[in-house]
Each structure stands twice: as C-alpha cells, then as structure tokens.
Amino acid sequence: MNLLDSIKSENTGFETTLIKGIEPIRQFVLAISIYHLFDTKLFSLLIKHEVASPEVACNELGMEKEKLLGLFRYLKNEGILLETIDGFSLSKEGHALAPFEGWYVMLVGGYATTFLQMGERLQEGAGWATRDATKVGVGSCGISHFDAIPLTRSLMAQAPGTCTKLLDLGCGNGRYLAEFCKALPQIQAWGAEPDRGGFEEAVDLIEKEGLSHRVHISHSGAVEFLDSDFDFEPDFIVLGFVLHEILGQAGRPAVVNFLKKIVHRFPAINLIIIEVDNQFDNAGAMRHGLALAYYNPYYLLHCFTNQLLVQDADWLDIFAEAGLSLVTRETTSDQVDSTGLEIGYLLRRA
C-alpha cells in the first residue's frame, strides 16, 4: 500500500485536518499581501478611485498588469477586494484594514526577514538577525497614533508646567512629532533618528506638514545626540521604545549612565519613557487576544534582534538607580489595548 492509499484508509478526514494544518501558511501569505497593498500605494489608489481597473493602477503606479492581476485576484479570493466589470475595489473588510497599516509595516515590512532568519540564527555563534530599521520606525510611528501618542499626552497633562520644547530621541519617521506640533501649537520640537531612511522620511514629512519652522530633525542615535553640542533646552524628553535597544546592545550600566546624563544636563526635565513590560512567560497575560495577535510575535522578534525587553519592576529599579523619581505611570487605553503591557512612565529628577 502506498502512502496515499494509507492516508485514505486510515484517515478519511485527512482533508479537514490538512486545511487546519496549513491555515498558518494562508495567514502568512495574506499578511504579506496586505502589507504590499499598503506599501505599493495600491491601497491609497483604491481609496482614491473607489473602483480601479488594472490598467489605471498600472498606469499610475508603473506596474506590470499580469502580476497586478495575480495580486488582485488573490485578494479578491480572500475577501479583501471586490471585482466588477469596471475593475477592483476594496471590500468592507478591505476598508476596515486602513487603521492597521502601521502594524503591517512594522511586523511584516520591518521584521519579515527577521522571522525567516530564525532557524539559522538559533545556531551557536550565528549572531543576530537583521531587520529593516526604516520600516520598523515608520510602522512604529503609525501604531503610536493609537497607543503611544495618547499615552504621552496623558502623561504630559500630569507633569508640572506646560510643554513648549519637546525632544524626541528616536523619532522614527517624525509622525509622532508632527502630530504633537499640530495638536499643540505652542510646541517647538527636535527629533533625533539613527536610521538614515527614517531620518530622511522624517525630514520629508515635517516639510510636507509645513512644520519645518517648528521641528528640527537630526540624523543621530539617542546617546550620541545627547553627547553632542546641540542648542536646545527641552522641558520634555520622550524616549519611546528606545531604552530596551540600549539595554540589549550596551547593557544596564549604559542605560543608567544615559539617564543620568539627561538629568545632569537638564535638571528640571520631564522625562517620558514608553516601554513594553516583558510578560512573554506569563501564561495568563498571553491568553489575551491582542497578546497573541501582537505581543507574542513582538516578544519573539526581540529575542533575535539584540534588543532586551524587561519587566516593569526592572525598569523601576533602573530609573531609581539613575536618580529618577516616578511621578506616575500609565498603560494604554482599554479601547485600544487592554493588555496593560505597554507602559508609559513620567519621571523627574529625584
């Protein structure tokens, strides 16, 4: 009896289990295809035209028709697009994806190569996996619109005084700064971004938003920028998802020293730090739907990219060692993220 006959005789439900067994492959390809829908500007084109023929899309975006038809047909079969005699349009499910572009840009555009390298990087001495730092920054800024920016504004409201000069160390594509400056017209801001691609996108974004007279962008890492001779006296500094990179790459003493330098240079500074509480091994926390959908892959990728996530209590110890006093701490709005895993800290010199 050959293998196929054996399968037929022993398990008449093989097809059912096959469908279930390869469902992750379907979701893998679907996630990548949705990412490309955003990244190629096809999503924006379909929003603009409502219904677009392949010819229109190819002419506007310089694409090859047969390849584009393949992508459109695939997404139609997955319920993301609809097809009529006039062309393709976004379905209700497709339109509903719009707010989530940042998650696709960061996790797929930024870290797809990381996930594909995991096997080889498991080997002793193999080093760290690579990532697309530009996409990581752009995606993170897109996500921040929903979580980190409202969290930061809430913490700002509880600080003494008002924010007039904001320094963002690790500003990504500048979206964070642009949103703050549009919402708070009294603010002057400066952002530092180590990734060349992210820096260039930030400069372009600030110019397009008409904020060049209020926002300055530097191509620099957070530590290097703080050590430089910049002429800016902030009353608030924001470090969003930056310290765990320093912690992973340079160790705890480097993080403590960096924070000490901040309060030494700016004794009256209001310091806002946003990090993710490491609850990767907490079975109760990880049963949450968003914990599985987002934080589970988020925790995983950090194990392979020389970034060290630690627990809330560890951050509080680090802040105390650096001479900082906790004014307050908050998590994200339950309407956006009820896991309590993303934490914002408002700190001042002790």
Curated annotation (Swiss-Prot):
One of its GO terms (molecular function) is S-adenosylmethionine-dependent methyltransferase activity. The keyword Transferase applies. The keyword S-adenosyl-L-methionine applies. Optimum pH is 9. Keywords: Antibiotic biosynthesis, Methyltransferase, S-adenosyl-L-methionine, Transferase. Its EC number is 2.1.1.243. Gene3D superfamilies: Vaccinia Virus protein VP39 (3.40.50.150). Pathway: Antibiotic biosynthesis. Disruption phenotype: Disruption mutant cannot produce MeArg. It is an enzyme of class 2 (transferase). Optimum temperature is 45 degrees Celsius. It catalyses: 5-guanidino-2-oxopentanoate + S-adenosyl-L-methionine = (3R)-5-guanidino-3-methyl-2-oxopentanoate + S-adenosyl-L-homocysteine + H(+). GO terms for biological process: antibiotic biosynthetic process; methylation. S-adenosyl-L-methionine-dependent methyltransferase involved in the formation of the rare amino acid 3-methylarginine (MeArg), which is used as a potent antibiotic against the closely related soybean pathogen P.syringae pv. glycinea. Transfers the methyl group from S-adenosyl-L-methionine into 5-guanidino-2-oxopentanoate acid to yield 5-guanidino-3-methyl-2-oxopentanoate, a precursor of MeArg. Belongs to the 2-ketoarginine methyltransferase family. NCBIfam families: ketoArg_3Met. This is 2-ketoarginine methyltransferase. It comes from Pseudomonas syringae pv. syringae. The gene is mrsA.
